Amino acid sequence: MLFENPSKNIESLIAKSADLTNKPFVHSVVKINGEYEIEEEDIDLTVNILCRDKEGKRLEIYDLELELFKSNKELVLVISKLNFPDEPILWCGVKTLWMNSNNGKKCNSPKYSSRLENLANRIKSFLD
């Protein structure tokens, strides 16, 4: 990554990735917990990705929760719909799969799967 202060810019990187994969909306990122240290190549971070239309009106239906962490030195992203806890969850590590949010078992991808998979791949390409 080519950032002078990456810990302050990861939120911007995630927001810009969401902007590109969920046009025409604008996104902001709020850190919930965790840290990101590029020098240690370690990450354990949870953020909310908040969506707005071009006029600035909140669109909570598109809000997401994103968890980023390393597992066996591999970057893993878990994306869920923030305000819809019963919707499937995207697990994007070495493999990408969709999980039932109630029991954690593999399930079919939802209609909107490509949008979230594209977001995960874009973020991974910046951080991996």
Give the location of each predicted region.
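Aromatic- and glycine-enriched beta-alpha-beta binding-site module
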Residues: 58-98
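Ampiphathic alpha-helical segments that act as solvent-exposed interaction surfaces
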Residues: 94-128
